[in-house]
Structures are given as C-alpha cells and as structure tokens.
C-alpha cells in the first residue's frame, strides 16, 4: 500500500511539474488508533523514505515541491499523550533522517488534532530552530473549527466567525515563527 501510494504521489508530482505547477506531496500517516509516538515515528519514516525514493525515480525536482505530512504523534486512543516538546523533537528527528534539505517547505496537516494542539506542536517545532526547511501549516479543521462553530450557519454570526478565524490564523502565523504562547489564546 505504501509503495503504490508513493508511486502515485510521485507520478502526480512529476505531472504537476511538467505543467509548471508546484505539487503538494501529501503522504499522511493517520493518527487513528492506539499506536505510540514511537510507532508513528517508524511508520512516518518508512513512508517518507519510500515517497522520496519514488520522487527521485520519477525525476521530480525536490526544490519545487511542497511537502504536506503528518506530525509524529500518538494515536487518538492513547490516553497518556506525548508533550508538544516531545512531538516536536520526534517529528524533527524523523524528518532530518529522511527529508532532503532540497525540500524548501513543509506544511503540516493537523490530522485531527485540536486547534490548540496543532498550533502548539508547530510552535514547538519552530522553536527548535536552525532547520533546513520552512515549517508552516495547511490545517483544515484546526484552522476553521472555532469559526464554523461561531458562525453556525447564521448571517448574524458572520462577524464573530470572521474574528474567530482571524484569531486562529494569527496564532498559527505566530507558531510558524516560534513566537506563539498559550497566553495569547482567548
């Protein structure tokens, strides 16, 4: 399954580049289940090894891709979760082993994390500093959940929803700089 998906991602990336489009390469290891952070590390590492092998085999210019992976994190059913600092350290350690320095940027999936978890984990990674890639976010739920809840489909809630969305975007922007702090949350 990993090989087939990696092959498909590489073909997609090559076709994008042939058409002057920057491919978003998204090899996601799901956080569903009771796996430990160490198991996620192993599977993420193996997945990325296969993906980059296929990208190279297909002649993809790694300087012209955007990598959109998961963070190395405990499964959703694990009750004693790893700290954000541990998640950051494990994620960066894993990526330093397998993600070539030619890759200019990594934009993380939130993968089901809460808004605060995703922001704090990204912030902790950027606080490590001196990384060969720019680390940012490509969150769905972890960027939009508060805004959607505030809006609730009602026109009269649009301003409140917009403020909630802008706040989350600002918090994640600060996290990309390693300058987020829990005290900034409302």
Language-model-detected regions and their locations in the chain:
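Helix-rich catalytic cores of soluble enzyme domains
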Residues: 1-53
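Active-site capping/gating regions of soluble enzymes
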Residues: 35-186
């Amino acid at each position: 399954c990993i090989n087939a998906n990696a092959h498909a991602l590489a073909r997609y990336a090559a076709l994008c580049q042939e058409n002057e489009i920057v491919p978003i390469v998204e090899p996601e290891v799901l956080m569903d289940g009771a796996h430990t952070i160490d198991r996620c590390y192993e599977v993420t590492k193996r997945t990325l090894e296969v993906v980059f092998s296929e990208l190279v085999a297909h002649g993809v210019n790694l300087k012209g891709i955007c990598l959109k992976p998961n963070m190395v994190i405990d499964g959703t059913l694990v009750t004693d979760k790893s700290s954000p600092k541990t998640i950051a350290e494990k994620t960066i350690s894993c990526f330093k082993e397998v993600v070539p320095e030619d890759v200019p940027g990594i934009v993380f999936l939130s993968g089901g994390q809460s808004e605060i978890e995703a922001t704090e984990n990204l912030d902790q990674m950027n606080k490590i500093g001196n990384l060969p890639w720019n680390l940012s976010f490509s969150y769905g739920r972890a960027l939009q959940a508060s805004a959607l809840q505030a809006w609730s489909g009602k026109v009269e809630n649009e301003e409140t929803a917009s403020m909630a969305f802008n706040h989350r975007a600002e918090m994640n922007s600060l996290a990309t700089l390693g300058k987020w702090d829990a005290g900034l949350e409302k």
